[in-house]
Amino acid sequence: MTDKYENPTSDDYMGVVMGIIMSGGNAKGLAFQAIQQAKDGKFAEAESSLNEASEQLREAHDVQTDLLTRLAQGEKIGWNLYMVHAQDHLMNAITFKDLAVEVVGQERRLQALENK
């Protein structure tokens, strides 16, 4: 039986790749939503969106960690441009979410100062 990570053209492998891409895209969208909510003064909603984004990223990161662990243990992992794209998508989403946390914090501070 072939492992789902060995054949980069298998449906299972592409399912893993698409899962990483979708989780990254969902997380980035939620992080952007959090920024918009913070601009509207909806900080509880913004925090909720950031928490959801973190959960999406955790799911994708778990898959990434599993891949790296298997590779480190000597398992054959097939790589293709789709997987590279998925990893890039995930890292961009992580960075965007981290920046969104900062933007939400700054927006909270700004609105507090404006309301004094």
Curated annotation (Swiss-Prot):
InterPro entries: PTS_IIA_lac/cel, PTS_IIA_lac/cel_sf
DNA-binding in keyword set: no
One of the Pfam families matching this protein, by short name: PTS_IIA
Domain PTS EIIA type-3 residues, every copy: 11-109
Keyword Transferase: yes
Molecular functions per Gene Ontology: metal ion binding; transferase activity
Record text on cofactor binding: Binds 1 Mg(2+) ion per trimer.
GO terms of biological process kind: phosphoenolpyruvate-dependent sugar phosphotransferase system
Comment on protein domains: The PTS EIIA type-3 domain is phosphorylated by phospho-HPr on a histidyl residue. Then, it transfers the phosphoryl group to the PTS EIIB type-3 domain.
Record protein name field: PTS system galactose-specific EIIA component
Provenance organism: Lactococcus lactis subsp. cremoris (strain MG1363)
